């Protein structure tokens, strides 16, 4: 059985990147929450 995590920078950016987050209302809420919390990295 293969491992479930097969790293890919492109897929990671497309699924969890800044533009992917900002594309939806809920994604914008995630970024806003992380900003309020003071996270150094907002998205992947």
UniProtKB/Swiss-Prot annotation:
GO cellular component: ribonucleoprotein complex; ribosome
GO molecular function, one term: structural constituent of ribosome
Protein origin, superkingdom: Bacteria
GO biological process, one term: translation
One Pfam family matching this protein: Ribosomal_L34
InterPro entries to which the protein is assigned, alphabetical: Ribosomal_bL34 (IPR000271)
Alphabetical keyword list: Ribonucleoprotein, Ribosomal protein
Membrane among keywords: no
Coiled-coil residue windows: none
Keyword Ribosomal protein set for record: yes
Family: Belongs to the bacterial ribosomal protein bL34 family.
Record's protein name: Large ribosomal subunit protein bL34
Gene: rpmH
């Amino acid at each position: 059985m293969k491992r479930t995590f097969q790293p890919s920078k492109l897929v990671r950016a497309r699924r969890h990147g800044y533009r992917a987050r900002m594309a939806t209302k809920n994604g914008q809420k995630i970024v806003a929450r992380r900003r309020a919390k003071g996270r150094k990295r907002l998205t992947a």
